């Protein structure tokens, strides 16, 4: 049986330099390889024509580019596209392409499933199977047909990015480095429930935007909706955020799904104003998308507008996020590959 080759895709410049040294290739070959990967986006090592034939053959013995196309796609009536990817371990993940008038955003996954078990999220109901490598995360960007149209990237797909932060930070380095994609960090937003072990490290090691899943300003209620609150509370998250400056390039936002009869009254808006006082941020209000076996409901637009207007009038910039891809289960909280995982015989935790 042939030994699987190691993917070059998802490797940082430092890692490529180590590979080059190990193979006895000239030092400058590392930047040639990263250029072929992240600028020209080749599919095979044979296409790296400024490497000598000898060095290409040496590289091919143990390595491959490692790009793999989606195995399935679903298209929404609103233009949103949901892509299904199979990982080398035969796990399944989803990514969502969201075109808009002057923007094109890709929502990527960082894990197969998720440990956080948020009450309102289908990925959380799926349970956790595996972390994704930098290769598997970057492949979602590398391998969609619309990759050259992308203006923005959000880590809001399957999984908790801070629970797989080593790999997420590698991807962010590749995307924002001169040797990689060369993107501005302002094009990228990472969303998290706010894990303590990852929050400060992310803020210190990355300049990308941060989105915190709040969903209620009341800790006792947040514990019911989001078990992660038990380990690290929303008030502790806010305490840490006060130590950072979000008034310049990096943007801080709070995600707030509005549930009927749960967190939709202006009492909650008032508490949000108190909680966020002194922090430069915005609140994104999100309509709840019903998922199976969850006894939560969304609210009407009138309620959303009243909530937004209260926040704005009291000094907290707020927006209502447009729902996209609901008809193909691609909207916020609706991603799940539980069906595919079950069909291949994976035991979900």
Curated annotation (Swiss-Prot):
It is an enzyme of class 2 (transferase). It catalyses: adenosine(2503) in 23S rRNA + 2 reduced [2Fe-2S]-[ferredoxin] + 2 S-adenosyl-L-methionine = 2-methyladenosine(2503) in 23S rRNA + 5'-deoxyadenosine + L-methionine + 2 oxidized [2Fe-2S]-[ferredoxin] + S-adenosyl-L-homocysteine; adenosine(37) in tRNA + 2 reduced [2Fe-2S]-[ferredoxin] + 2 S-adenosyl-L-methionine = 2-methyladenosine(37) in tRNA + 5'-deoxyadenosine + L-methionine + 2 oxidized [2Fe-2S]-[ferredoxin] + S-adenosyl-L-homocysteine. Keywords: 4Fe-4S, Cytoplasm, Disulfide bond, Iron, Iron-sulfur, Metal-binding, Methyltransferase, rRNA processing, S-adenosyl-L-methionine, Transferase, tRNA processing. This is Probable dual-specificity RNA methyltransferase RlmN. Pfam families: Radical_SAM (PF04055), RlmN_N (PF21016). GO terms for biological process: rRNA base methylation; tRNA methylation. Reaction proceeds by a ping-pong mechanism involving intermediate methylation of a conserved cysteine residue. Its cofactor is [4Fe-4S] cluster. HAMAP family: RNA_methyltr_RlmN. Residues 100-321 form the Radical SAM core domain. One of its GO terms (cellular component) is cytoplasm. S-adenosyl-L-methionine binds at residues 159-160, 191, 213-215, 289. [4Fe-4S] cluster binds at residues 114, 118, 121. It comes from Phocaeicola vulgatus (strain ATCC 8482 / DSM 1447 / JCM 5826 / CCUG 4940 / NBRC 14291 / NCTC 11154) (Bacteroides vulgatus). Its EC number is 2.1.1.192. The active site is at residues 94, 332. The keyword Transferase applies. Binds 1 [4Fe-4S] cluster. The cluster is coordinated with 3 cysteines and an exchangeable S-adenosyl-L-methionine. The keyword Cytoplasm applies.
């Amino acid at each position: 049986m042939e030994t699987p080759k190691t993917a070059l895709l998802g490797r940082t410049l430092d890692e490529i330099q180590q590979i080059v040294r190990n193979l006895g290739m000239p030092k400058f070959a590392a930047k040639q390889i990263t250029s072929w990967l992240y600028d020209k986006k080749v599919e095979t090592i044979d296409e790296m024509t400024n490497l000598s034939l000898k060095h290409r053959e040496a590289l091919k013995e143990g390595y491959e580019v490692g790009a793999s196309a989606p195995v399935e796609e679903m298209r929404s009536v609103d233009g949103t596209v949901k892509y299904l990817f199979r990982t080398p371990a035969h796990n399944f993940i989803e990514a969502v392409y969201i075109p808009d008038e002057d923007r094109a955003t890709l929502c990527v996954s960082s894990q197969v499933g998720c440990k956080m078990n948020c009450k309102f999220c289908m990925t959380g109901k799926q349970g956790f199977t595996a972390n994704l490598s930098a290769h598997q995360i970057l492949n979602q960007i590398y391998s969609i047909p619309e990759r050259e149209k992308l203006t923005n990237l959000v880590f809001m797909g399957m999984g908790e990015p801070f629970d797989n932060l080593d790999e997420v930070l590698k991807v962010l380095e590749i995307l924002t480095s001169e040797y990689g994609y060369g993107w501005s960090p302002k094009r990228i937003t990472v969303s998290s429930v706010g894990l303590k072990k990852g929050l400060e490290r992310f803020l210190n090691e990355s300049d990308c935007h941060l989105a915190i899943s709040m969903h209620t300003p009341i800790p006792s209620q947040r514990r019911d909706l989001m078990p992660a609150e038990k380990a690290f509370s929303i008030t502790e998250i806010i305490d840490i955020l006060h130590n950072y400056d979000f008034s310049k390039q990096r943007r801080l936002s709070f995600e707030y799904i509005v549930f009927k009869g749960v967190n939709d009254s202006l009492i909650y808006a008032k508490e949000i104003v108190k909680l966020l006082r002194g922090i430069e941020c915005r609140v994104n209000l999100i309509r709840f998308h019903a998922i199976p076996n969850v006894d939560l409901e969304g609210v009407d637009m009138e309620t959303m507008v009243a909530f937004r207007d209260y926040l704005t009038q009291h000094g907290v910039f707020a927006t209502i996020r447009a729902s996209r891809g609901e008809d193909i289960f691609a909207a916020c909280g609706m991603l799940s590959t539980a069906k595919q995982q079950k069909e291949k015989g994976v035991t979900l935790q």
